[in-house]
Amino acid sequence: MANIKSAKKRISVIEKKTALNRVRKSQIKTAIRRFEDAVAAGNREDAVAKFQYAQKRIYQVASKGTIHKNAAARKVAKLAQKLNGMNA
């Protein structure tokens, strides 16, 4: 356990940021899972709506620094590939 006041504060701040990052990552995973469920069901309109929401959440989380912007782009590209694969 830290003895210095600033170190104690850093521990507290890091715990808060970690919890917030965990929430944000969970939101991304949930959005992706809902999109994939819509794709599996074959419902194109629903899948498009879920894709747009997932894309929005992923880029928001990337802008906050929770995930890297390239990781966000990679996730969105994978989802777009699945969405475009529904046409075939």
From Swiss-Prot:
Keyword field contains RNA-binding: yes
Biological process (GO), any one: translation
Molecular function, one GO term: structural constituent of ribosome
Lineage top rank: taxon: Bacteria
Gene Ontology CC: cytosol; small ribosomal subunit
Keyword terms, alphabetized: Ribonucleoprotein, Ribosomal protein, RNA-binding, rRNA-binding
Keyword RNA-binding listed: yes
InterPro entries cross-referenced by the UniProt entry: Ribosomal_bS20, Ribosomal_bS20_sf
One Pfam family of this chain: Ribosomal_S20p
Annotated transmembrane regions: none
Classification via SUPFAM superfamilies: Ribosomal protein S20
Family: Belongs to the bacterial ribosomal protein bS20 family.
Classification via HAMAP family: Ribosomal_bS20
Function summary: Binds directly to 16S ribosomal RNA.
NCBIfam families assigned: S20
Descriptive protein name: Small ribosomal subunit protein bS20
Top-level taxonomy: Bacteria, Bacillati, Bacillota, Clostridia, Peptostreptococcales
